[in-house]
Amino acid sequence: YTLEEVVARNYLIQERPDAILNIIDGTNLERNLYLTTQLVELGIPVVVAINMMDIVRKNGDQIRIDQLAKELGCKVVEISALKGTGIDEAAKEAMQAAESKIPMVPQHKFCGCVEHAIAHIEEACLHDRPEAQQRWYAIKIFERDDKVLEQLNIPDRKSTRLNSSHAEL
């Protein structure tokens, strides 16, 4: 991880902002949505603002905003920073998300065996974490994220058990 990624992640986990306004490049949607899905897993309300929609349309492409919002489980708005359009709407939606204080419920589900492993990790070692963060931590443990494993300081016997269930997949 870069220093910027570590600082950003630590802030989101430790400070728990009221909402996240995730501005992504509409011309490179796939790469940007990976981060978006990780943000949604944090349980913090997220608003996605897709930038460069004017260029997306100019290129003859389209993004189904309603479908994307449904799949992500959060508000999605179109913006163009160059033209200054949609920015007020994005800010308004982010404020509403922050004021609602309703935690995100991730819509994305993995295949059954992975979901089972994530649930097992949550039950085995995350009961001391806030409920809204448990899924994110479980996914990171499943991914064997070194920073998270170090932060959580999971005892060796639990780590061995988790690794054996991971190996079964």
Language-model features: where?
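Helical mechanochemical/support elements of P-loop NTPase systems and associated helical scaffolds
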Residues: 4-7, 16, 31-35, 60-64, ...
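Flexible beta-alpha connector loops of hexameric P-loop NTPases
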Residues: 1-2, 53
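Long, well-ordered amphipathic alpha-helical subdomains in the mid-to-C-terminal portions
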Residues: 105-161
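Canonical P-loop GTPase G-domain recognition
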Residues: 56-108
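Conserved C-terminal guanine-recognition region of P-loop GTPase G domains, centered on the G4
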Residues: 7-75
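Single conserved hydrophobic/aromatic residue that forms the stacking wall/gate
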Residues: 162-169
